[in-house]
Amino acid sequence: ACAAPPPAAAPPADELEMWLGTLKGSQKVIYDCVMPAGGLDGILFARNFLKFSQEKLGTKDADMSVIVSFRHFATPYGYNDAMWAKYPQFASMLKVQDPKSMKPAARNVPLHDEIEGFPGASLPALSARGAQVTVCGAATAYLAGILAGPKGDAGATEKELLANLVPGARVVPAGVVVVQRAQKAGFAYTFAG
């Protein structure tokens, strides 16, 4: 008797699934950064995954697909220094002090400094190793409304935030959507806090 051929894989349902399909590493993980400390922990966890997979197991960066997803209260880590300087609410909301000045951060600290002093635990270092960053579009719209206030233009503020993402970041409809789609695409899920 002949076995029936396996069903053909369904084509990607949308742009997000198509993008996830381009991430070809056999070792796949998404770090779900939800709370303020989770943004920093997600960066550190991604660094540890890349570092120790390579050093202890010999896994090459090309064989690893890593996503750090900033959503909910960790979303501001997806914006560049200009937005952190313009909107001091990010530092107060996330309770982030600049380790150089010991004052509320007026810059996106992980764009410049290594988390907890660990070499390679920064956004540029992760990017150089092929890690991807996603930024929650739903949280961005919510934050834009808060930043604009009742008399401001939330739509214009949202456009400004989306035009000022950290280098290489990708906006996604919602962080919960990329988390689900990544798991569907074979990514292991890690809650970073």
Predicted regions and their residues:
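Secreted/extracellular ectodomain signature
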Residues: 2-193
